[in-house]
């Protein structure tokens, strides 16, 4: 409830609406407080609690090399190209939770789908790869350096479906990725 951010607010509202419509909803997330906090500092305890009527299952975030991430991220912010190794470092040293990805892969049959929002985070990237056939993406896509990463292309092209928040967002995705076979809303 108290976590700021546009994508977080959108997901919170979506969860409440789905729950109100009678769907079983559970949020899978990390123990990190918010986007602006230290991504390797686990503030919340791992486990499940009910927040605003919706179960929230939290997983420990991994430690990370912030300086290495910041070096690559600075280049991406300036729309500079990065090597495949730097791209892998970007996803690896961003906010991550191997426990979360193992849970998704090991409990996929317990869920109808996994909704990932927004696109450029380690939790989205590795979460989609853990179970692409049940992954839905709400990308919040912008024409920025992150959008041009091959790993981002990979998840856009592997997910079961994509929900775009605007027509320009969908048009950008169509220009950047091969999403013709992906269900879109």
Task: Name each model-derived stretch.
Residues 1-57, 109:
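N-terminal subdomain of nucleotide-sugar transferases
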Residues 67-122:
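Conserved nucleotide-sugar donor-binding subdomain of glycosyltransferases
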Residues 33, 120-123, 168-170:
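Alpha-helix capping/helix-boundary segments
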Residues 143-147, 159-184:
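A short, active-site helix/loop in glycosyltransferases that binds the activated sugar's phosphate group
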Residues 135-140, 146-160:
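A conserved, positively charged/aromatic
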Residues 110-120, 124-143, 163:
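Active-site proximal beta-strand in glycosyltransferases
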Residues 126-130, 150-154, 176:
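A short acidic, amphipathic alpha-helical/loop segment
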